[in-house]
């Protein structure tokens, strides 16, 4: 296949500088595992191996690409992270279709890095506001009685968790998850789950007592959201949702400032 020669280094010591500040230097050679990964990925995308079909064994891949076992295993692990193969102990890798969760998961590291920069949290909170605003309007216009009942059940669990902060956070996430499920789009679900995971992970540690009032306020705001959806009033549902998320954002911003002052 010519894989081994795909990125031969060609250092030309006499090559001119590029611009005023860049000196000539050889391009870094790709690792063998990366080259194997790219070749296998192209074969999968060309449907040379169909969904559900097993790839050749590690030994066969080693011989085919003329590389060692570590390179093959690293390549397969990278394909697994991309959702292109599944690997079970004792079995050959099997071709799979990337899920929405896998696609969003690939962005997780970059998202967490972005959140750590100044303004990062505010940008993600704005993204959540725009995203959930569309979800709640859709819910008010299209939610079935069964879906509204699921929201009501999530709200009931919310009310039962007011005095337990860890349980309330879980019930809060579940309430918004039920809302995100209403359109029936798996990509929406993956984005929503990731957004909340990233934002919650970036929140400061706060004493339990300080959270009790916040929990009660959030619960009352959830009631307003469900009431508007039940009445099939998208404008009121949107106002209730935006009021809720803006309140949550302001509260956690205040918690963060208080935490920083104590350091």
Curated annotation (Swiss-Prot):
Arranged from A to Z, the UniProt key words for this protein are:
DNA-binding, Repressor, Transcription, Transcription regulation
For this chain, the annotated S-S bridges are: none
| Gene that this sequence comes from | nanR
* Any one GO BP annotation for this protein: negative regulation of DNA-templated transcription
Q: What does this protein do?
A: Transcriptional repressor that controls expression of the genes required for the catabolism of sialic acids.
Q: Please report the name of this protein according to its UniProt entry.
A: HTH-type transcriptional repressor NanR
Q: Which residues form the HTH gntR-type domain?
A: 30-98
Segments carrying the region annotation (Disordered) are: 1-22
Q: Report the DNA-binding ranges.
A: 58-77
Q: Kindly list the GO molecular function terms attached to this UniProt entry.
A: DNA binding; DNA-binding transcription factor activity
Protein source organism: Escherichia coli O17:K52:H18 (strain UMN026 / ExPEC)
């Amino acid at each position: 296949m010519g894989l081994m020669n795909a990125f031969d280094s060609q250092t030309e010591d006499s090559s001119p500088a590029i611009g005023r500040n860049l000196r000539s230097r050889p391009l870094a050679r790709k690792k063998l595992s990366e080259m194997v990964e790219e070749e296998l990925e192209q074969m999968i995308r060309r449907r040379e191996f169909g969904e559900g079909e097993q790839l050749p064994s590690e030994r066969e891949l080693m011989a085919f690409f003329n590389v060692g076992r570590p390179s093959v295993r690293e390549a397969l692990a990278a394909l697994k992270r991309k959702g292109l193969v599944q690997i079970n102990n004792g079995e050959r890798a099997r071709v799979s279709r990337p899920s929405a969760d896998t696609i969003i998961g690939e962005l997780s590291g970059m998202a967490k890095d972005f959140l750590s920069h100044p303004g990062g949290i505010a940008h993600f909170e704005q993204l959540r506001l725009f995203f959930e605003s569309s979800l709640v309007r859709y819910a008010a216009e299209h939610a079935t009685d069964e879906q509204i009942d699921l929201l009501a059940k999530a709200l009931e669990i919310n009310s039962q968790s007011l005095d337990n902060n860890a349980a309330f956070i879980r019930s809060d996430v579940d309430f918004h998850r039920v809302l995100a499920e209403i359109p029936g789009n798996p990509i929406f679900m993956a984005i929503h789950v990731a957004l909340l995971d990233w934002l919650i992970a970036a929140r400061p540690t706060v004493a339990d007592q300080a959270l009790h009032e916040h929990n009660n306020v959030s619960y009352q705001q959830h009631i307003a959201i469900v009431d508007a959806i039940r009445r099939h009033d998208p404008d009121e549902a949107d106002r209730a949702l935006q009021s809720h998320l803006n309140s949550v954002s302001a509260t956690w911003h205040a918690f963060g400032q208080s935490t920083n002052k104590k350091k």
